[in-house]
Design a protein with these regions (language model features):
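Intrinsically disordered, low-complexity, charge-dense segments enriched in Lys/Arg
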Residues: 101, 105-182
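Basic helix-turn-helix/winged-helix DNA-binding cores
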Residues: 1-103
Length: 182
């Protein structure tokens, strides 16, 4: 890949940051608002998105709790942020298993903020913006190891999706010419 292509791919992850638990709306959001908020956080990443029907299915399957008076809470938003990322590499059954594990050890706020920290730690590394990745604590439990593995897998999938999107854009802009220039 050319240097310009690599720069455009890396741009997907530059300055990426998720809102922390306390920064998520404290008032309930309707389904469309919930989907819009989650998708806005991952706008630069093709494939990391939710639809209203997906969210409704997660509720029906019991992966997240039912909305209260048709409004989704901060805890449900946090769960949906994680689902948006992990659904690209895990089955719903495995996502639900990880949710159950984290609930045994951490509050929703702790688990979500740790997820944010890990994603923000791994993305720059996978996208080539940083040469190291912060190590897990020696006493990290199984749930943290599984989360790290999920995030590294998802970050690699996010990288590939960005790379293919850049390649398709370049081919659309310069059909046939790129091959001649190579």
């Amino acid at each position: 890949m050319k240097e310009e292509s690599n720069r455009r791919i890396a741009a997907c992850a530059v300055d990426f940051a998720l809102p922390r638990y306390e920064e998520l709306p404290s008032v309930g959001l309707y389904l469309d608002q919930t989907v819009q908020l989650v998708n806005s956080c991952f706008r630069g990443f093709p494939g990391v998105e939710l639809t209203p029907s997906m969210v409704s299915n997660y509720v029906k399957k019991g992966v997240i709790s039912h909305p209260v008076k048709k409004k989704y809470t901060r805890e449900q938003l946090a769960s949906l942020m994680y689902i948006a990322v992990s659904k690209t590499v895990l089955s719903m059954e495995n996502i639900d298993t990880l949710f159950k594990m984290q609930r045994q050890h951490f509050s929703a706020a702790q688990a979500y903020d740790y997820f944010c920290d890990e994603l923000e730690n791994c993305l720059p590394y996978v996208f080539g913006l940083r040469h190291t990745i912060r190590d897990l604590a020696e006493d990290a439990g199984e749930e943290k190891l599984l989360l790290r593995s999920t995030i590294i897998s998802a970050a690699n999938k996010m990288y590939l999706d960005c790379a293919f999107a850049v390649m398709r854009q370049e081919e659309a802009l310069w059909p046939g010419i790129l091959a001649d220039l190579a």
